[in-house]
């Protein structure tokens, strides 16, 4: 799994799949790894409906693992604003990409609580596995 610059909190993987195929693969991989899909936002369509010129495709998948979310909230209720996790499928310059903001990096910027770093590392391991599964053509979730 690659980071564009190596220092960014963005986790981005390129896939050879089409945008629609990658979206279907991600949707299948989410429950296969124990997460729930809370919603899908088609950002590209929303922008175009609002009259904004946007030539790329972008869908945001809001996902959650309830037990992990409860651990975050038990440690610091104000971190509800960082939930749920968001995974994204998008196109850029002809490439299809699947990505997220690193849960470890995000929670580290918001709290130094050791329990939160443990939860973030566990969540990141699973969400990276979700992305890797979805990015692999023909990989059954």
Predicted ranges, named:
Residues 7-9, 57, 83, 94:
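A generic structural signal for well-ordered coil/turn residues at beta-strand boundaries
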Residues 27, 44, 128:
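Short glycine-/small-residue-rich flexible loop motifs, especially phosphate/cofactor-binding loops
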Residues 38-88:
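Compact, glycine-rich, soluble single-domain proteins
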Residues 80-93, 131-140:
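Short secondary-structure transition/capping segments
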Residues 86-113:
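Beta-strand/loop substructures that line and gate deep hydrophobic ligand-binding cavities in soluble
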């Amino acid at each position: 799994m690659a980071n564009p610059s190596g220092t960014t909190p963005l986790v981005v993987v390129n896939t050879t799949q089409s945008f629609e195929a990658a979206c279907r693969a991600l949707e299948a991989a989410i429950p296969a790894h124990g997460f729930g899909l809370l919603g899908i936002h088609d950002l590209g369509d929303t922008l175009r409906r609002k009259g904004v010129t946007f030539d790329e495709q972008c869908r945001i998948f809001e996902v959650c693992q309830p037990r992990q979310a409860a651990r975050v909230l038990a440690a610091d209720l104000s971190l509800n604003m960082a939930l749920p996790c968001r995974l994204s499928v998008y196109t850029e310059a002809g490439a299809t990409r699947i990505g997220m903001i690193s849960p470890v990096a995000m929670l580290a910027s918001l709290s130094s609580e050791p329990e939160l770093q443990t939860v973030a590392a566990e969540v990141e391991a699973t969400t990276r596995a979700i992305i890797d599964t979805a990015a692999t053509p023909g990989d059954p979730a």
